[in-house]
């Protein structure tokens, strides 16, 4: 059992013990909500059991709903921890002023998880989860970074590199999103495009059509790709020919050299540490 699975269970149980059980609801409803909270917390485990690694075959509505609820439970857990920490820190003061109350189970009329604060925390968690999902699903904004490189040859001054990372193409992002990312990247008119891993969340049999828009990425000196950990789970060897057909130059502990106005520029790419889990070559910067 992984650490993530154990911690997810802890989150769910914390929400149950600190929010659901102390409430004034009847026991059948408490049981239903407790199981629901635990299922939401264990979203990653349930996804793997039902839909396989990374949920490549999960329908988009299920992916969105489960992701939203998992995030909400996670945020609710953090809010409850913050609240309980505040109660513990202020306990000496409240005790000295006669305002103390039991941290866990108190009298029926003084349960800390009931009433206004419980409703407020749940509502805040749902709202923050919704905001986070909206931000995650929008086309990412362009972030421009100007680098000062001492001794840079004049021929390379102003060389423009567009970096794409963690696209995680899968059931969550639709075709419009993928097309917009490509269009926005091309509009920058980069000299070189580098894709630094975690392009896909699934196998080619499921996602080859979804990654097709990446073939429209255009740069004067081409598109270079180095894998991330998410390429290894579904099978990196299956994805390599797909990436190459999309026009990407794949670098795995390798380098390639381009000439910019007659000046050589070496581009190196390494594998991900996840390769070691599959008996493949791990990252080797010296070799690259």
Predicted features along the sequence, with ranges:
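Non-catalytic terminal accessory segments
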Residues: 1-138
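Soluble catalytic domains of enzymes that build or remodel membrane lipids, polysaccharides, and related
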Residues: 143, 148-288
């Amino acid at each position: 059992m992984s650490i993530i699975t154990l911690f997810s269970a802890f989150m769910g149980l914390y929400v149950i013990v600190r929010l659901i059980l102390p409430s004034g609801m009847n026991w059948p409803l408490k049981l239903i909500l407790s199981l629901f909270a635990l299922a939401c917390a264990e979203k990653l485990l349930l996804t793997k059991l039902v839909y396989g690694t990374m949920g490549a075959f999960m329908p988009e509505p299920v992916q969105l709903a489960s992701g939203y609820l998992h995030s909400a439970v996670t945020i609710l857990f953090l809010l409850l921890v913050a609240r309980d920490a505040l109660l513990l820190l202020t306990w000496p003061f409240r005790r000295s002023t006669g305002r103390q109350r039991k941290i866990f189970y108190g009298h029926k009329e003084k349960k800390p998880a009931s009433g206004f604060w419980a409703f407020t925390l749940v509502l805040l968690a749902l709202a923050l989860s919704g905001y986070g999902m909206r931000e995650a699903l929008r086309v990412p904004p362009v972030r421009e970074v100007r680098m000062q490189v001492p001794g840079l040859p004049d021929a390379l001054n102003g060389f423009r590199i567009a970096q794409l990372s963690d696209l995680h193409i899968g059931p969550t992002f639709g075709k419009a999103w993928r097309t917009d990312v490509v269009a926005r990247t091309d509009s920058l008119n980069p000299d070189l495009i580098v894709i630094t891993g975690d392009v896909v969340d699934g196998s080619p049999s499921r996602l080859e059509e979804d990654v097709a828009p990446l073939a429209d990425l255009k740069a004067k000196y081409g598109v270079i790709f180095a894998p991330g950990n998410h390429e290894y789970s579904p099978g990196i060897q299956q994805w390599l020919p797909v990436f190459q057909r999309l026009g990407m130059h794949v670098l795995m502990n390798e380098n390639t050299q381009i000439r910019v106005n007659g000046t050589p520029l070496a581009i190196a790419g390494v594998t991900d540490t996840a390769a070691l889990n599959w008996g493949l070559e791990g990252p080797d910067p010296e070799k690259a």
